[in-house]
Amino acid sequence: MATVAEPIPLPNGLVCSSHDEEKTAEFIEVLSGVRNAELVGFTVENATIGTLRFEVSTTSDIAEGDVIFTRISGKEILYQILDAETAEENFDQNPRGTHIVRAAQLGCYTSKDGFIKFPWLPAMNSPLFAARSREFQKPITTEREFEVGKVPSTNVGAVANIDDLVEYHAAILGVTGTGKTEFALDLVGEAIARDVKVFCVDFTGEYKQRLADLEPTFPAPTPEQAVDLENKLFAVDTGEYGAKTEKKTLKKGIDALRESTAEQISRFLESEKSNLAVFELAEITNTKATLRLTELYLSTIMTWAREHRRARQIMIVLEEAHTIVPEVFGSGFDADTQFVVSRIGQIALQGRKYGVGLMVVTQRTALVSKTILSQCNTFFTHTLIDQTSLNFLDSVYSSQHTRLIPNLGRFEFLAYGKALKAERPIMLRREFDQKKKGCERRAQKPNANCGGSGWNCRCGGSCRDRRRWTSNTQTLKFNTVPPPGRGGF
């Protein structure tokens, strides 16, 4: 007959293991398929194919954006943490607190194809493991591909294809200070390195300074042509009812401009010396003139592309796009402004046929033409906080991903679309580059030795006076401003 064993004397507070740690490690390795895997939780009810819910210990060392994995039918499926909440369970009227985490499926990862979505979900109580506990193979890229960011808590880089990025249009969104422009500048550099002609419309003056090492050209009307156009637009707005005579004069002036514009665009697109053009109109204070000239140059690019079908791959970058292609319909803009914006919008609708793509960069998503944004097939979204912008992005990402956007940190962004080797939205992170911060400060520093002011600025756009004039073009109130020398109304 069995007898009761003598109790083992233990100090108070000592926790003893009731199992063999070595066998436990072997068991976890069998479940995860990875040696030294870190168990973080177990799936719970209400999980779906796209979104996983799992319970973790309150002491688990995980965070928003981290990646976890589980095995389904012998395959390793990755998920990214989007959100978490506290929950309470009762066992015989004894409440217990816990954390329930939501994670979105990234899919199966391979170094060649990136993230491929998986068509099923794990069973209840399936174990989940931290991706940081294992090493992944680095992505295999072709000469037309490059890395755009790292997946948090992993050594995996997300890869984009430059051809899809250009042909199917892209949008870079985010409020000021989130790394949006830095990212756009990097994409411009990647495109130029792959022999893409890049035409940047930039009224901030930053691209000229930051991309100087790429030896850009600067197509633009002469100061005399710019003043003449402003005068003609002013005459149309202030002339007699209908302004028939003034409109005829304006049309002749624009036709004359079209000829010189065509020469500049042809020279740039056919040149082998430079793949970058920066279009600035800092001297122009009339916003209608700014829009007219922008439309003229972009339409000329489209005309060249039609005549030389796919002879060159062309990417048009619209920095601060809300000032160039605003959402005009139903917003109090006049018919002339609506016409100009719709003409620019045709590039988004027809550009792919001729090898012309758009890259829209803006901090005010809600104010950009939805005709253009809806044609973008790849989105890189940094922090946004206004509800109108988030409502639009509900149609791009899932609502769960959209809720993540206001919480993104600097240099963090959501990426999704045709150009990426990822079939589901993915949160990415980029490292802070101190050298770029120094370049940004130099670009913003006023030039005390300019010697000119306003229209006579001679420093290339870095002086205070130049920036003051530039800022006048960045308003969404399309009121007619008298050109210099015309005085007030």
Describe each model-derived feature in a short phrase.
Residues 86, 109-110, 204-208, 283-286, ...:
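Conserved nucleotide-binding/hydrolysis micro-motifs of P-loop NTPases
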Residues 400-412:
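Conserved C-terminal "switch" segment of AAA+ ATPases
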Residues 195-196, 274, 355-356, 374-378, ...:
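Short glycine-/polar-rich loops that comprise or flank the Walker A/P-loop
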Residues 176, 285, 289-400:
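Conserved P-loop NTPase motor cores
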Residues 270-271, 412-489:
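Conserved P-loop NTPase motor module
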Residues 143-219, 415, 449:
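Glycine-rich phosphate-binding loop of nucleotide-binding enzymes
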Residues 1-169, 187, 324, 368, ...:
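Basic- and hydrophobic-enriched, low-structure N-terminal and domain-boundary segments
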Residues 189, 194-281:
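Switch/coupling segment of Walker-type NTPase motor domains
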